[in-house]
């Protein structure tokens, strides 16, 4: 102890010129900073892959549709204009620039009559389908369909103009046609795909503004339905509400909504039901350059150019509302996404191909077969040609063939699995007929004698209300495959391709004839002569 005090005095002697006592004092009363303390996040339930609770079997089925055909007018639907039938559609709108959204209805595997049911226990397990193979067949030849507008708002050619145009007149619209952006698309999921487009938004403080003001824009998400228009090269937007002139784009989209698949939202969906996988190929270049006629709502600032002389055409600056005409360029069979099989081994989301609700959604876009057929009907027969003696019609036809390979899967219904599925979609357990069974009623019931008498209340039993379809307000091309399942995969083209790539062997159908035993040659005995 004496040595420790000695060393302390020696230290004080050498640091006598430095005041270190306040340092020791500060260290003795130091406290941590009173800044904000960040606590760890509250644990939340995780979304797991379907492979965690779905067991796959070695049972596969093939299912295919019939030849699916549709024919209509490529630009607009034709309605009956007679009195009383103004809303009846005589010829629908069928364009190569439309989405085809097929809603595939599958049979309930829990009601299947399997020859051997020993592979699962119906008391503790349920069966579901998993899509493992898909082939979308497209008929009809390759072709480019064009569209246009008989009164398109096109003022001047801004690409190869040899003179400066003057002021636009009252009406400078022209008849112009063009081809569109080239798109091939396939989306597979058990829920409808989600699209996005720009629509008219709501201004702040209910300020509607003055007539002619630019409307606010809002990105809108909506379900892609069968018949919705794709992005043709003019953007994904609501042309009906954002273009009042109805002359800025071709007639097939001037009053429509062009949607683009919202890949970002579907990819970030927690359960991954809308997008198992997708195939996409887009191609476009610009063919011509024009500008619009009309008053510019946002004029070019004066500091960006030097004013022209009053004596020439440059005294008035032309419209800077430039726009191009898109083009999808050449279509070839070498760049086709269709008429070939695709095998689903691992989906990009948590749903690895499980068809919840016994349904599947296949979304198809193919603008490489968008040929518009011209039909001509004779009104009056004469020896000389006259235009008035013939009527011209436009029609577009499409042909599809859908083939699938489904794998039978089973789910063991533990308490954790049922809780997870109920949180994901409560209707799944309802379809599996899980619920509390009410006890037998012990109350006294009333029974009337004359059930048809008008003196008593109606005795007809109210029919039970059927299950309401949550997608009844949407338009899909429904394809029923409930009676088109087959276990004989080798009898169908896609089934044979699946057996080949999976290394499986089809069950023999015919018994081979028993091979006959080889004849034993009898040696001749030598006879002495």
UniProtKB/Swiss-Prot annotation:
Region ranges (Disordered): 507-529
MF terms in GO: structural molecule activity
GO cellular component, one term: T=7 icosahedral viral capsid
Listed GO biological process terms: endocytosis involved in viral entry into host cell; virion attachment to host cell
Family annotation (Pfam families): Late_protein_L1
Role this protein plays: Forms an icosahedral capsid with a T=7 symmetry and a 50 nm diameter. The capsid is composed of 72 pentamers linked to each other by disulfide bonds and associated with L2 proteins. Binds to heparan sulfate proteoglycans on cell surface of basal layer keratinocytes to provide initial virion attachment. This binding mediates a conformational change in the virus capsid that facilitates efficient infection. The virion enters the host cell via endocytosis. During virus trafficking, L1 protein dissociates from the viral DNA and the genomic DNA is released to the host nucleus.
Subunit structure: Self-assembles into homopentamers. The capsid has an icosahedral symmetry and consists of 72 capsomers, with each capsomer being a pentamer of L1. Interacts with the minor capsid protein L2; this interaction is necessary for viral genome encapsidation. Interacts with protein E2; this interaction enhances E2-dependent replication and transcription activation.
Protein's recorded name: Major capsid protein L1
Gene from which this protein is expressed: L1
